[in-house]
Amino acid sequence: MTAEITAEGLPVPPTAIEGEPVAAGASEEEERRRRRKRGLLLLLLGFLAMLVTIVIWYLIFRQPISPPIPLIPESQIPTYATAVYGAQRPSGVAVSPSGDRIYVTQSEGSRVGLVFDAGGNKVGTMAPPESTGTQHVPVYVAVDPLTSEVYMSDRMTGAIYVYDRDGAYQRTFTLAEPRQGWQPLGLAFDAKGNLYVTDLSGPFQKVLVIDRTATVVRTLGENDKLSFPNGVAVDGAGNVYVSDSNNGRLLVFGTDGQVRAQVGRGAGQGNLGLPRGLAMDGQGRVFVADSTGQGVFVFRSPSGDSQRLDYFGFFGGEGIADGTFEYPNSVAVDARGRVYVADTFNDRVQIWSY
C-alpha cells in the first residue's frame, strides 16, 4: 500500500486511510478491564454473603459469656451531706426510723454508746452496767422496730445490752435457753421484731434467729464455714444477708436457709475486701461497709428466683476529707433513705443522702 500525498506534499498516515482497522489493541485492553471489574464485583459479593452468614449465625447461636449488667442510674449512689463528730473510734451505728436519734458505739475512750439528735448534738449515753470503760468493747447496735429499744453488742463481755430510745439502760438480753459462751456481734431486726445475731462461738460460727420470746428458732451458716461474720441484715422477702468478713464474702440466705447468692473477693467491680456492717433500705438496696475498701458498696437484693446480686456502685475512697473514709465499719439507713456510716479512724459518722 502506498501513502497518499497531500496538496502540501506531506504523506497521509496509513492509519487514517479509510478501511484500515482502527485501535484493535485498545479493544482488547477494554475487555480485560471489564473482566477485572466483573471479578472484583464477584469477590465483593462473596465477601458480603459470608459476612451476612456470620452475622445471622451469631444472632441465632450466640451464648453470652456472663449475664448482661443492667444500666444503673446515678441516683442509686447517694451523695455526701454532712458528718457527726464526738465519738472516739466509732465502730457501730444505728438510727431510729425517723432519723431523730443516731446511736453510735465507741471502741476507744469511754467505750460507751452515744445518742445524737438529727442535728448531730449529743443527747445521751448508753453505758453498759457496772461499766469501767476497758471492761467493755461495744461494737454493733440495732433498733427494735416494735419498741424503739436499742440493742448493743459487747465484744468483751459477750453480752447484748438493751436501752430505751434516749440511752437509759433497761436490761441485759438473755436467751430463753442460755447458750454457754455465746459471742454475739452483729445485730439486726426484721419487720416482725425477730432479732438476728451473728455468733462467733463454737466450732462453727453462725447466725441465730431469735423470736420475741428470746427463743432461737433458726440457725444459719453453720455449714458454710463462716469466719468472723460481722454485719447482718434482712430484706422484706425474708432473705438474710451476712458479711462473712474474714472470707471477704457477702452471703445471702434464702428462706430455706440455703445460700442463694454471694459476692466475694477479687479485682472486678463490686468485689469485696473486708466487708463489715450491712444495711438495707426500702428500695431493695444493700449497703456494705468495706473497711479495707475504704467505702461502701451498694448492691440490689435478688428478687424472684434470681441467684445474683446486681452491683449498683461504690461511694467513698480513702482519706480525711468530706466523703472519704478511714476504715468504715458500720452502716445504717433511716426511713427517708439517708445513709449513716461509722467512719472509724476519722472519728465521725458520715451522713449521705439521695
Which ranges hold each PLM region?
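N-terminal intrinsically disordered, acidic low-complexity segments at the extreme N-terminus
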Residues: M1-E30
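Blade/loop signatures of beta-propeller domains
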Residues: I56-I77
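A short beta-strand motif characteristic of beta-propeller blades
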Residues: P78-Y85, K122-T132, Y169-E177, V216-E222, ...
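Beta-rich, blade/repeat-based domains predominating
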Residues: Y85-S98, S131-L146, P178-A191, N223-A237, ...
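Conserved beta-propeller blade signature
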Residues: R101-V104, E149-Y151, N194-Y196, N239-Y241, ...
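Short loop/turn segments immediately following the C-termini of beta-strands
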Residues: S107-E108, R155, L200-G202, S245-N246, ...
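Short loop/turn segments that connect beta-strands within beta-propeller blades
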Residues: D117-N121, D164-A168, I210-T215, G254-Q258, ...
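Blade-level signature of beta-propeller repeat domains, shared across WD40, Kelch, NHL, RCC1
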Residues: E326-Y354
